[in-house]
Amino acid sequence: MVTFEVIKFKLLNSANYGVPQKRERVIFIGKKKNGKITHPEPTHSENGEDRLKKWISIKEAIWDLEDKEEDINFNHILTTHNSEFSEKIKNTPIGKSVFGNYSDAFFKAHPDQPSRTVKENHGGVFVHYKNNRVMTPRELARLQSFPDDFIFEGSKSKQLVQIGNAVPVGLARAIAEHIKKLL
């Protein structure tokens, strides 16, 4: 069993590390020996203050997929909705749920902000800000900062679970690079 002598934890927001998503996670960093423990410094901020880059918005992350045709090999799998549901989506304002009172389901994404936390539960959490449909696995993967050459395997629902359960790539990279400097 490994025993750590020094442990420090901090709440980190993925958007502060170049991820187009406001996903907050408590990150623990520990060392076996005495020494200073720090967490990675942010590279981005909400308004780009303190010489940091501005947070990346949903639109910046996925704009080029708006009119892209379905491509199963690229994980850009479109969902076909019935006309009644498509009309509901169309009439839902940005920042609101298609179902009104549900704060976390079928939320119409705000294009000019980072997204809410991408989760694995029910694949229709994010409604596209422009198109009357839920976001594709590839769009959600981009919100998790996965590179386009990372291909998810399995059914669409299994892809959504993999994407939603992942640590955002940009945050993981920032933490790993910082820990490497501490060694």
Positions of PLM-derived features:
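Class I S-adenosyl-L-methionine
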Residues: 1-108
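C-terminal target-recognition/interaction regions appended to catalytic cores
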Residues: 65-183
